[in-house]
Amino acid sequence: MATRHQVRQSIVSLLYAAQLNQENKDFINEFLDEKKIRNDQRKFTLDLYNGINEQLALLDEKINECLKEHKLDGVASIEKAILRLGAYEILFTSTQKAIIINEAIELAKEMAGDNAPKFINGVLDKINKEVQ
């Protein structure tokens, strides 16, 4: 069974693929099967993924409000996916905010550039402070 961290890695990968116009239902199901994401974890994955897509405009607006030098369009695709996942979880789930931000930082360390963890931490921390 996949861990929550592995589920989040998969969501970031799916969001990244969607940005590259490679999203379709068959791809999503095959991807989740390949990653052995089943049952409750599959539901958790799809709930987060679909929720992010449903709230994409709001998430991008919130993220843009927290960016100093550039807007989301100038952010690398993988970092954008991590930010969207983190922002969605902060705004729409009951998961502890410290866990959400820590997970996003870990995803950035694993999947993004050297400066990404600090950048993602800063943006998500601002979003978190706004909703408290």
Curated annotation (Swiss-Prot):
UniProt keywords (A-Z) are: RNA-binding, Transcription, Transcription antitermination, Transcription regulation
Annotated GO biological processes are: DNA-templated transcription termination; transcription antitermination
Q: Name one GO cellular component term.
A: cytosol
**What InterPro entries does the database record attribute to this sequence?**
NusB-like_sf (IPR035926), NusB_fam (IPR011605), NusB_RsmB_TIM44 (IPR006027)
GO MF annotation terms: RNA binding
Family membership noted in the UniProt record? Belongs to the NusB family.
HAMAP family linked to this entry: NusB
The record's annotation in NCBIfam families points to: nusB
Q: What is the recorded function of this protein according to its Swiss-Prot or TrEMBL entry?
A: Involved in transcription antitermination. Required for transcription of ribosomal RNA (rRNA) genes. Binds specifically to the boxA antiterminator sequence of the ribosomal RNA (rrn) operons.
Per its record, how is this protein called by name? Transcription antitermination protein NusB
